[in-house]
């Protein structure tokens, strides 16, 4: 038993010794292996700090890659580098916009340049020897295998096998936008544009030791260029580069202005146009595939292609396109392109598309040249052609707009004959031009040119059907077949008198129009439904609150507002014309002073009183028989008294601006004109409205009961003071205090109510509105007699209404007698 136990102990001791020897042998082998790997690592063309920290697997991987590279270099016909080439080797990688990568036919990266760390964040030794499929996007693996395949089949005669490769590859990148390095597990995908070719190398010893022929070695040599994101472009863009943005269907939504200098296109004309319209036809297939890759991988570089210039020819361009994704839903939003123009315009005389023919058929000229040629040939062109050209070129009209400090020269609307404007105005009385169609063709042309209404609205006879202010007018209103009249107004003449010394300054600085005919515009009967007489009340009333002045609602006739009630028990002291003081002198504009047959300054030196008297004789009345009776109504507007200090004219208080604008009118300005005028003359009314209406009837015509009922209704009113009497009348008043210059006279507004009766539905209405102006006040305040026109008091204007066929107005007891006879 003891012998058996001793034998077992010996066996245990021997086994332990063997194990210890085995461990020592293994330790010795590992140490020798480590020494070999250490020596092998230092033989690799790597920095010492890199090679000293490599593990055995890395050393083997790098060594195998190095041996393969050496095999490729030995297989190729390499020239002996001289000293100059050796010095230039260090600059090659700096000149590249990417890194160099060499792949075997199975996808191993046997070589990669050391500048890969600059673009991808991964170091050279981390990638060398690894398979490219470990670092690329899974969706690109199939395309990558196709690029690595070299087909050795038969090639058609006369054609060489294509060994060029160009594709886009998504590879892992550990660089952040700030240039920092992240973990490989958090790496993002960066698009690389890989261009290169396949090389097939035959070794020097074509046969192995066993007598078998070795297959040629195939590798893919690539230059990988990362496509920068537009938001991370570090290098400033030069003058040969322009940016563009496109929708997902490749239509321009933005383009840089530099494209104008490079290709001739204006950025505005490219918006909404597809970029395919400007590609050269031979490059369309290549660009279509490139755009397909862009939507698949997010970024592409088109390479050099031809893009058509505007006036013919093409330029070579290289574009970097990037798809911009929405940060919320990660959906593609737009495409941003950085376009590098690498050449000038080539074959600029050659036309490639229809867009380029537009410049040949329609040469583009500058706006300045067009306007110069247009106005230098204006004598030989008619007005219609000039209007058409100006209408087609609205942008060119801005060249004609006056700038600050320019001298404004009033245009002469008269003819080119030897007759002056004074002689033209002498031919026809001025009121005929203002209120009635002129018989003079020259004056008609002037009126048409000054009219703010469209040219299609030709002047028609003035008619009115809504002013039964006088008893005789009311009688004619109720008649079934009234007659219409055409009135002609004249002014008495006096001798020429020189104006006061202060008139010169007024003439020089006055920006007013040339004649009173420019202060009016007429409204045709076609506008009756929109431009009713109640609009005049709302337009010139101080307390109006109407929001819509052009109201088309019909209102009943307010009979109490047509004429004042004059009680018989009160004895009003009515004054005749000879008891009134003559008109006072006023300064006139040079245009009004030239019209000798119509207006002349008087001898008075006081400021003018805004009065007007019109006499219609039987010789001047023209009766025209028609189906219905048409009224003739004239609404004349006057400004405040001239002795009130005037403020500088503005666009809202004057119907004409300093530059001669004709856009302002009572019907357009509305309430704003009255408000501005009230601010400039707060102590006096701004507009005095006078309605003159006259008819001819048979003297023996009797009033029917309707007239009596109308007058009875009128007499129910009471007169509290003069102001209320003025506002109640149907005819506005003209009053002024000639002896008191310090106080301003309150002027009343004409209040008119109008409607259409059933018998007058077909009648046509025409209203003449004379816009308020100081010039009109001065013009109308002057007459042609040595003794000026008499000043009318409030009672004269209200009571002494002109009756049929009479040149003189009833006065005093005769008027009271006439009123008693009516009752």
Swiss-Prot record:
Region feature (CTAD): 783-823
Gene symbol of the encoding locus: HIF1A
Annotated positions of the 4-hydroxyproline modification: 402, 564
Residue numbers of S-nitrosocysteine PTMs: 797
MF-aspect GO terms: DNA-binding transcription factor activity; DNA-binding transcription factor activity, RNA polymerase II-specific; protein heterodimerization activity; RNA polymerase II transcription regulatory region sequence-specific DNA binding; sequence-specific DNA binding; transcription coactivator binding
Region (DNA-binding) location: 21-30
Residues that bear Phosphoserine: 247, 551, 576, 589, 654
Positions carrying (3S)-3-hydroxyasparagine: 800
Record protein name field: Hypoxia-inducible factor 1-alpha
Cross-link named Glycyl lysine isopeptide (Lys-Gly) (interchain with G-Cter in ubiquitin), sites: 532, 538, 547
Annotated segments matching region ID: 576-782
Modulation of this protein's activity: Induced by reactive oxygen species (ROS).
PTM annotation: S-nitrosylation of Cys-797 may be responsible for increased recruitment of p300 coactivator necessary for transcriptional activity of HIF-1 complex.
Intervals of motif Nuclear localization signal: 715-721
Occurrences of domain PAS (ranges): 85-158, 228-298
Family matches, as PANTHER family: HYPOXIA-INDUCIBLE FACTOR 1 ALPHA, HYPOXIA-INDUCIBLE FACTOR 1-ALPHA
Span list, region Disordered: 1-30, 493-522, 581-607, 638-688
Interaction with TSGA10, as annotated region: 1-401
Gene3D superfamilies noted in UniProt: Helix-loop-helix DNA-binding domain (4.10.280.10), PAS domain (3.30.450.20)
Region (Required for heterodimer formation with ARNT): 170-191
Compositional bias per record (Polar residues), positions renumbered to this chain: 493-517, 651-666
Location of N6-acetyllysine modifications: 532, 706
């Amino acid at each position: 038993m003891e012998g058996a136990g001793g034998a077992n102990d010996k066996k245990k001791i021997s086994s332990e010794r063997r194990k210890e020897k085995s461990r020592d042998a293994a330790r010795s082998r590992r140490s020798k292996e480590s020494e070999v790997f250490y020596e092998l690592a230092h033989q690799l063309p790597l920095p010492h700090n890199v090679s000293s920290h490599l593990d055995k697997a890395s050393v083997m991987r790098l060594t195998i890659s190095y041996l393969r590279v050496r095999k490729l270099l030995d297989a190729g016909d390499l020239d002996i580098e001289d000293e100059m080439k050796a010095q230039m080797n260090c600059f090659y990688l700096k000149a590249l916009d990417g890194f160099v990568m060499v792949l075997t036919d199975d996808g191993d990266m046997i070589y990669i340049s050391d500048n890969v760390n600059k673009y991808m964040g991964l170091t050279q030794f981390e990638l060398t020897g690894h398979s490219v499929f470990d670092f690329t996007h899974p969706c690109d693996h199939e395309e990558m295998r196709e690029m690595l395949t070299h087909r050795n089949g038969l090639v058609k005669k006369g054609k060489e096998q294509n060994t060029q490769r160009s594709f886009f590859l998504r590879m892992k990148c550990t660089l952040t936008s700030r240039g920092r390095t992240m973990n490989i597990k958090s790496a993002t995908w960066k698009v690389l544009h890989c261009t290169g070719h396949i090389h097939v190398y035959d070794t020097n010893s074509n046969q192995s030791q066993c007598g078998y022929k070795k297959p040629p070695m195939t590798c893919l040599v690539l230059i990988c260029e990362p496509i920068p994101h537009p938001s991370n472009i570090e290098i400033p863009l030069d003058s040969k580069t322009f940016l563009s943005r496109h929708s997902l269907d490749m239509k321009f939504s933005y383009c840089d202005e530099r494209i104008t200098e490079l290709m001739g296109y204006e950025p505005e004309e490219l918006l909404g146009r597809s970029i395919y319209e400007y590609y050269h036809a031979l490059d369309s297939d290549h660009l279509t595939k490139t755009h397909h890759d862009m939507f698949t991988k997010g970024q592409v570089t088109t390479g050099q292609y031809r893009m058509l210039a505007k006036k013919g020819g093409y330029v070579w361009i290289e574009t970097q396109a990037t798809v911009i994704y929405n940060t919320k839903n990660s959906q593609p939003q737009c495409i941003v392109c950085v376009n590098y123009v690498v050449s000038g315009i080539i074959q600029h005389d050659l036309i490639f598309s229809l867009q380029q023919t537009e410049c040949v058929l329609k040469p583009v000229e500058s706006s300045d040249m067009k306007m110069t040629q247009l106005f230098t040939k204006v004598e030989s062109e008619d007005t219609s052609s000039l209007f058409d050209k100006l209408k087609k070129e609205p942008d060119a009209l801005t060249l004609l707009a006056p700038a600050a400090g320019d001298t404004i020269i009033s245009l002469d609307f008269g003819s080119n004959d030897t007759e002056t404007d004074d002689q033209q105005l002498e031919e026809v009385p001025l009121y005929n031009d203002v209120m009635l169609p002129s018989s003079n063709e020259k004056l008609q042309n002037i009126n048409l040119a000054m009219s703010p209404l469209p040219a299609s609205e030709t002047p028609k006879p003035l008619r009115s059907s809504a002013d039964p202010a006088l008893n005789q007018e009311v009688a004619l209103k109720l008649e079934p077949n009234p007659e219409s009249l055409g009135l002609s107004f004249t002014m008495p003449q006096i001798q020429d008198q020189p104006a006061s010394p202060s008139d010169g300054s007024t003439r020089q600085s006055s920006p007013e129009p040339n004649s009173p005919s420019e202060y009016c515009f007429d409204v045709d009967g076609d506008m009756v439904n929109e431009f009713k007489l109640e609009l005049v009340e709302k337009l010139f009333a101080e307390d109006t609150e109407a929001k819509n002045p052009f109201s088309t609602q019909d209102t009943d006739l307010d009979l109490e507002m047509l004429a004042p009630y004059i009680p018989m028990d009160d004895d009003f002291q009515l004054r005749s014309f000879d008891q009134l003081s003559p008109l006072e002198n006023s300064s006139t504009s040079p245009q009004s002073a030239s019209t000798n047959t119509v207006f002349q300054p008087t001898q008075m030196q006081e400021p003018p009183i805004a009065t007007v008297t019109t006499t219609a004789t039987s010789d001047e009345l023209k009766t025209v028989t028609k189906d219905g009776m048409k009224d003739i109504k004239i609404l004349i507007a006057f400004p405040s008294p001239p002795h009130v200090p005037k403020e500088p004219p503005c666009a809202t208080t004057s119907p004409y601006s300093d530059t001669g604008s004709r856009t302002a009118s009572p019907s357009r300005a509305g309430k704003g004109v009255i408000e501005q005028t009230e601010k400039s003359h707060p102590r006096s009314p701004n507009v005095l409205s006078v309605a003159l209406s006259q008819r001819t009837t048979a003297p023996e015509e009797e009033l029917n009961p309707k007239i009596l009922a109308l007058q009875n209704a009128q007499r129910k009113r009471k007169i509290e003071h003069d102001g209320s009497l003025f506002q109640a009348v149907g005819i506005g008043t003209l009053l002024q205090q000639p002896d008191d210059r310090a106080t301003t006279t309150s002027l009343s507004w004409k209040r008119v109510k109008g409607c259409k009766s059933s018998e007058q539905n077909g009648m046509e209405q025409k209203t003449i509105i004379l816009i308020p102006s100081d010039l009109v006040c001065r013009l109308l305040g002057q007459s042609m007699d040595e003794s000026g026109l008499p000043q009318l008091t409030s009672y004269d204007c209200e009571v002494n209404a002109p009756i049929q066929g009479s040149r003189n107005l009833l006065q005093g007891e005769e008027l009271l007698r006439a009123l008693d006879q009516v009752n």
